[in-house]
Structure formats: structure tokens, C-alpha cells
């Protein structure tokens, strides 16, 4: 948590929103508020990686996927990566409870400066946004969706991945 304490004094939030960290992603990291949009969650997750706040990454992943994550590997990756910038390319409201955010993140890895571009899917469960992680084992198309709404995966979040 010392990274977060240090970040609270940052004038500009690492998510590049042009807001002070404490008024932007900091309030989410400290659980003083929850992101109201998928884009806010995307920005707060990026900032969590910048600050190596892996517990936040885990709790903002779809609840049914959280136990499938490997926090130690996420921490190792975060420790070996220097984040240089975030650009939100597009946000889409897919349904009332599902949104997509396309972004590009620039980072310095072991191989040099790289860009990661992705279209991420977010789901709103009980009035909170979560990231649907496509890198962990997903249900088959006929199994219940990871979001818990009771639809088959193929007719819910699976249709957007």
C-alpha cells in the first residue's frame, strides 16, 4: 500500500485523465468509491498496474473469475514492467450491464518499449463494474456466463469476447 500512499500526493493521476490521483483512481483504490463507468474501471485498473496494486486487479475482475487469477504471476509481471502511458481509443455501451473499452497502453518491458492494444469487456454486477478476463479459463458456450446473470455464456459476455 506504500505505492498508493505515495501516489496520493501525485498531481496527475497515472491514468492520464488530467485529474489529481486522490480525486481520480485513488478514491477507487482506497475503496472510498466505486467506478461509475467501465472506462473509469479501465483507467483505475491501469493505474493499479502502474502502482503494482495487484489486490485491486483481483477484486475488480468478475467475481467468478477471481479464484482463477494467479496474483503472484501478476505481481511478477507488474514488478518487471514500467508503464509509460494510456490512451482510451473507444468506449461502447453494449447492453445495460455490459460495456467495451478499447485502449492502448505503452510500457517498457524486458524487450524494450512496447504497446498493448486491447478491446476489454466489462460487466456490471449488483451496480458495480468488473473486468471480464479473457486470459483465464472461460466457460464453454453452453455453460452459465461469468457475470452470473443466468444466461448461457454464448448469449451473454461470450458474444463480445
From Swiss-Prot:
SUPFAM superfamilies: NTF2-like (SSF54427), Sec-C motif (SSF103642). It comes from the Bacteria. Belongs to the UPF0225 family. This is UPF0225 protein NTHI0386.
Amino acid at each position: 500500500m506504500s505505492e498508493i500512499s505515495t501516489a496520493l500526493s501525485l498531481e496527475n493521476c497515472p491514468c492520464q485523465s488530467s485529474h489529481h490521483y486522490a480525486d481520480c483512481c485513488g478514491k477507487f483504490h482506497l475503496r472510498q468509491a466505486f467506478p461509475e463507468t467501465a472506462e473509469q474501471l479501465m483507467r483505475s485498473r491501469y493505474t493499479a498496474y502502474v502502482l503494482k496494486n495487484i489486490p485491486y486487479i483481483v477484486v475488480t475482475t468478475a467475481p467468478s473469475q477471481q479464484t482463477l487469477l494467479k496474483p503472484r504471476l501478476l505481481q511478477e509481471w507488474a514488478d518487471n514492467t514500467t508503464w509509460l502511458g494510456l490512451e482510451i481509443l473507444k468506449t461502447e455501451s453494449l447492453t445495460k450491464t455490459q460495456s467495451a473499452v478499447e485502449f492502448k497502453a505503452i510500457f517498457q518491458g524486458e524487450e524494450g518499449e512496447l504497446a498493448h492494444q486491447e478491446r476489454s469487456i466489462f460487466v456490471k454486477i449488483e451496480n458495480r463494474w468488473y473486468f471480464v478476463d479473457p486470459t483465464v479459463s472461460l466457460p464453454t458456450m453452453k455453460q452459465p456466463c461469468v457475470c452470473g446473470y443466468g444466461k448461457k455464456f454464448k448469449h451473454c459476455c461470450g458474444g463480445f469476447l
